[in-house]
């Protein structure tokens, strides 16, 4: 029996109708397209029989070259040949320039600070470049399948933020293609293996591609895929192995001042050497300089292993952290799935096997497994499998919440909550007559806003001018299947509402996520103390403001001595609240409350007298 039928409304397929949909692995280094045909899932080759399309785009005066054709010209025209554009998606130009890696491109800056590539065809942004990579994949699929696609599932790294995910959707939109869903790459691999191998239990997905590393811990049970935790490094991949090899060759050949053309030639040779060392103990590296000089050197597997050992060790450290987040041990992991071309590197497989204590799964081509999983998901979403037994649950990496008085964070959606998800919480006004409320959406695990990441701000206006605490504002957080966040605030009595969709301009790297998680544990005790202090300070401010209003209205109910005692106690509360002793503030508030109980009773009696003045018993 189906646990969940994943299909858009109105998309249930008729028995005689097969809808066309594909899965696309939009990779940093290479991209693939796959489809389900006659019950079999496979990647689709081009006219030359090539399954993978190099994620490379070259702009010339008269044309746009994509894939292998662009790769052939990359060494001669590096400035106009854009490689690994995925690394630029959702990042600011300032962030790119501040990075350690240099690029041969000429950049311009958009109005919102995002990078623009200056090409012979004008300025283009990463979204447009990504669309050029998608274009031949879509065309290939429609030609192979014999019709127009009704939707695609595109995979993205698990740590892509909202801006990066939206950019990927926008790239497809430029081509008029409907995106059924964005799917995390490790999760796509889990779908491929889950259906083919019928695995149950805890599975680790080790995904080392050209530009990113993702580790996901999933629990598979009776066709249910639940992501327990995710981790990784959005700036670590096979490209980094290539750059280390390139630096090694430059050092051996004593090449100091090199132009962009030679740099690209060295990079291409580095990739060839890396691939050759997958099966050989050593190989010869060779480049030809502009003057015709031929340079050669022997690179051994041992040398290459030494170069990349630190990077591979970083991936294993991420695995260890993510297992801890998931609350499982290596002994509980039944299988480790290898994803991405860089997992072919022998040292990677050796270290993964040593860490998890068992050989990793490689029965599905690690270069194609993500596209295959995406194709399976696309086939379900487009309506071809109405009785699907596949339930997919992803998680959010960091808690989402709202700033409250005192700079505190009220978490609405907790970290590692499965998505899609909707959570709601009620808030109220702080002051009498308050007609608007500002909302600050934050992300993180700390107790104070200052220690969390700001996502967005918006304001709800039109709140009825009631007494403090009388208005009820319902705030709803909704995270869709693609990880995009919508926040809505609604005043319950009037229905007035305001909302915002969070699309950050700047990416959040896994390194920042790891740092935020570490800090939340490191400063947990201090944070609780700071929160308790802030809560008492807010309560003191609320009590004093309320009492000031009461005295202004009904102060004549007190004699001079009583008023003097209350004023003195109020002054003491204000003085203590300015300090850093939460317990002292609490005691001061309690003393003030005790001292003003008689005043509160008189106010109540007076209010009753005023309300019933001039009325007879029969009218009450």
Swiss-Prot record:
**Record bears the keyword Kinase:** no
Pfam families in UniProt: HSP70
**Would the keyword RNA-binding be found if you checked this record's keyword annotation?**
no
Which Gene3D superfamilies does the UniProt record give?
A: 1.20.1270.10, 3.30.420.40, Actin, Chain A, domain 4, Substrate Binding Domain Of DNAk, Chain A, domain 1
Give the function comment from the record. Answer: Chaperone involved in the maturation of iron-sulfur cluster-containing proteins. Has a low intrinsic ATPase activity which is markedly stimulated by HscB.
Query: Record's family?
Result: Belongs to the heat shock protein 70 family.
What is this protein's name?
A: Chaperone protein HscA homolog
Q: What is the lineage of its organism?
A: Bacteria, Pseudomonadati, Pseudomonadota, Gammaproteobacteria, Alteromonadales
């Amino acid at each position: 029996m189906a646990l969940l039928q994943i299909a858009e409304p109105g998309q249930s397929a008729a028995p005689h109708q097969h809808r066309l949909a594909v899965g696309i692995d939009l990779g940093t280094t290479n991209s693939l397209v796959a489809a389900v045909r006659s019950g079999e899932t496979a990647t689709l080759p081009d006219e030359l029989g090539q399954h993978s399309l190099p994620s490379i785009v070259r702009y010339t005066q008269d044309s746009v070259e994509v894939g292998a054709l662009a790769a052939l010209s990359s060494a001669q025209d590096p400035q106009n040949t854009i490689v690994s554009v995925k690394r630029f998606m959702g990042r600011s130009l300032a962030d790119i320039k501040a990075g350690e890696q240099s690029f041969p491109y000429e950049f311009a800056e958009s109005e919102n600070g995002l990078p623009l590539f200056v090409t012979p065809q004008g300025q283009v942004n990463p979204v447009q470049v990504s669309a050029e990579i998608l274009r031949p994949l879509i065309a290939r699929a429609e030609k192979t399948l014999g019709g127009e696609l009704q939707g695609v599932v595109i995979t993205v790294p698990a740590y892509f933020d909202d801006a990066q995910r939206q950019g990927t959707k926008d790239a497809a939109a430029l081509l008029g293609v409907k995106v059924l869903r964005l799917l995390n790459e490790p999760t796509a691999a889990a779908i491929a293996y889950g259906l083919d191998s019928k695995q149950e239990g805890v599975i680790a997905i080790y995904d080392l591609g050209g530009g990113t590393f993702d580790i996901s811990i999933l629990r598979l049970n009776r066709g249910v895929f639940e992501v327990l935790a995710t981790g990784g490094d959005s700036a670590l991949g096979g490209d980094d192995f290539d750059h280390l090899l390139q630096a090694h060759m430059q050092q051996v050949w004593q090449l100091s001042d090199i132009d962009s053309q030679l740099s690209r030639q060295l990079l291409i040779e580095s990739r060839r050497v890396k691939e050759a060392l997958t099966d050989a103990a050593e190989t010869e590296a060779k480049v030809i300089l502009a003057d015709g000089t031929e340079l050669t050197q022997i690179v051994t597997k041992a040398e290459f292993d030494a170069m990349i050992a630190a990077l591979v060790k970083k991936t294993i450290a991420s695995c260890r952290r993510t297992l801890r987040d998931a609350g499982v041990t290596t002994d509980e992991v039944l299988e480790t799935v290898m994803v991405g071309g860089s997992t072919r590197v022998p040292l990677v497989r050796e270290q993964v096997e040593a860490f998890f204590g068992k050989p990793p799964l490689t029965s599905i081509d690690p270069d194609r497994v993500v596209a295959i999983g995406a194709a399976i998901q696309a086939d379900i979403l487009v309506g071809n499998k109405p009785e699907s037994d596949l339930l997919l649950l992803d998680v959010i990496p960091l808690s989402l919440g709202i700033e409250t008085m005192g700079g505190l964070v009220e978490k609405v959606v907790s970290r590692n909550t499965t998505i899609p998800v909707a959570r709601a919480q009620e808030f109220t006004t702080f002051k009498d007559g308050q007609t608007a409320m500002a909302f600050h959406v934050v992300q993180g695990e700390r107790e104070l806003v200052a220690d969390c990441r700001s996502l967005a701000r918006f304001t709800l206006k039109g709140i009825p001018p009631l007494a403090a605490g009388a208005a009820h504002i319902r705030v709803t957080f909704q995270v869709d299947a693609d990880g995009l966040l919508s926040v809505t605030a609604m005043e319950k009595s009037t229905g007035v509402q305001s909302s915002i969709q969070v699309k950050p301009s700047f990416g959040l790297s896994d390194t920042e996520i790891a740092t935020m998680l570490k800090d939340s544990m490191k400063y947990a005790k201090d944070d609780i103390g700071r929160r308790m202090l802030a809560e008492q300070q807010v309560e003191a401010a609320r009590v004093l403001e309320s009492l000031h209003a009461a005295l202004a209205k009904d102060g004549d109910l007190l004699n001079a001595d009583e008023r003097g005692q209350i004023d003195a106690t109020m002054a003491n509360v204000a003085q203590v609240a300015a300090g850093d002793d939460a317990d002292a503030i609490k005691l001061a508030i309690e003393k003030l409350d005790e001292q003003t109980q008689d005043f509160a009773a008189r106010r109540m009696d007076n209010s009753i007298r005023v309300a019933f003045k001039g009325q007879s018993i029969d009218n009450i």
